[in-house]
């Protein structure tokens, strides 16, 4: 899943709208929302709604299909923000952490590892391969 920061992609040139559509249409990659500006925790409810629901709307308009996954900026969340993400129509949301997902995990606080543009595949494999 590629989690897209809707405004940053346009402003900072990470991916063009055409690139986002192309990877989505490939069927190999799902597109999820990562807010409009990568800010969230410091905002009040109205601005958080614009970030959470607005990013979903922007991406769904671009792609012409539902965006069902959300990733919290910096992996940070609260119970209040979790409720707002759920109310915005997402099916699941992710935070950062190596913990195992189990039956008591909430769909709106699933853990994933963070992969950035500076991470190399061999290093990730070494880091996350269980030790013998």
Show where each model-derived region lies.
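C-terminal active-site subregion of NodB/CE4 polysaccharide deacetylases
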Residues: 19-26, 30, 36-132
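Short, histidine-centered active-site or binding-site loop motifs used for metal coordination
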Residues: 4-6, 35-38
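Active-site beta->alpha N-cap acidic-glycine motif
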Residues: 1-28
């Amino acid at each position: 899943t590629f989690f897209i920061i809707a405004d940053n992609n346009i402003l900072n040139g990470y991916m063009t709208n055409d690139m986002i559509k192309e990877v989505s249409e490939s069927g190999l990659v799902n597109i999820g929302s990562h807010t409009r500006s990568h800010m969230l925790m410091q905002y009040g409810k109205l601005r958080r709604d614009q970030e959470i629901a607005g990013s979903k709307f922007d991406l769904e308009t671009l792609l012409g299909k539902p965006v069902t996954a959300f990733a919290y900026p910096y992996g940070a969340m609260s119970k209040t923000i979790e409720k707002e993400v759920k109310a915005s129509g997402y099916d699941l949301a992710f935070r950062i952490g190596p913990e195992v997902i189990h039956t008591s995990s909430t769909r709106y606080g699933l853990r994933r590892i963070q992969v950035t543009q500076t991470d190399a595949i061999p290093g990730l494999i070494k880091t996350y391969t269980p030790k013998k």
